[in-house]
């Protein structure tokens, strides 16, 4: 396997992990926040405060410009951390105050993350790179992207 094949494989792995692990977990948290009883909602709000503080700390300190999840590369969503912090903060405030639509801030976070993922990888030409018929796993990633798009579209419609 040459360096280009390794880069493509890493890119495919990153895309797969983002879509099927990160987004799935975040969508589930939004769904759970919608489904949980109003009396338990404040507990989720306090948890979201911890996450919000983490986003703010990481952004201000610059401590996570690169990471293992991008195989040592630049973390492209670093500039979105203040927005993630804001959305988690809004969720926390509303959840702690037992406002039933608080989950919508988490759903918005998932949606914004997914949109920015597609924008970033389109601008960078990454979808073109991974959809090269000469690469043996190109069709697998294309199927994964197509499937994930429809799954997440369904999740967003369902929780909205």
What are the functions of these language-model segments?
Residues 6-15, 135-141:
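N-terminal membrane topogenic signal
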Residues 9-16, 72-80:
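Short, amphipathic, aromatic/basic-enriched membrane-interface segments that mark the entry/exit
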Residues 21-45:
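Membrane-helix boundary elements
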Residues 45-56:
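Generic alpha-helical transmembrane segments
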Residues 60-76:
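Membrane-helix interface/capping segments
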Residues 77-94:
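Hydrophobic alpha-helical membrane segments
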Residues 84-88, 100-126, 131-148:
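Alpha-helical membrane-associated segments of multi-pass integral membrane proteins
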Residues 153-160:
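Juxtamembrane boundary at the C-terminal end of a transmembrane helix
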């Amino acid at each position: 396997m040459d360096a280009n094949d390794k880069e493509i494989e890493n890119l495919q792995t990153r895309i797969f992990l983002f879509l099927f692990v990160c987004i799935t977990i975040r969508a589930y948290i939004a769904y759970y926040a919608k489904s949980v009883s109003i009396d338990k909602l404040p507990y989720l709000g306090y948890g979201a405060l911890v996450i919000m503080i983490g986003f703010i700390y990481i952004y201000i300190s610059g401590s996570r410009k690169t990471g293992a999840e991008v195989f040592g590369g630049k973390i492209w969503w670093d500039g979105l951390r203040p927005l993630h912090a804001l959305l988690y903060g809004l969720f926390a405030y509303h959840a702690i105050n037992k406002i039933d639509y608080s989950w919508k801030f988490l759903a918005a976070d998932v949606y914004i993350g997914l949109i920015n993922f597609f924008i970033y990888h389109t601008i960078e030409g990454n979808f073109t790179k991974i959809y090269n018929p000469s690469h043996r796993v190109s069709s697998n990633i294309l199927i994964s992207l197509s499937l994930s798009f429809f799954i997440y579209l369904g999740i967003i419609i369902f929780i909205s």
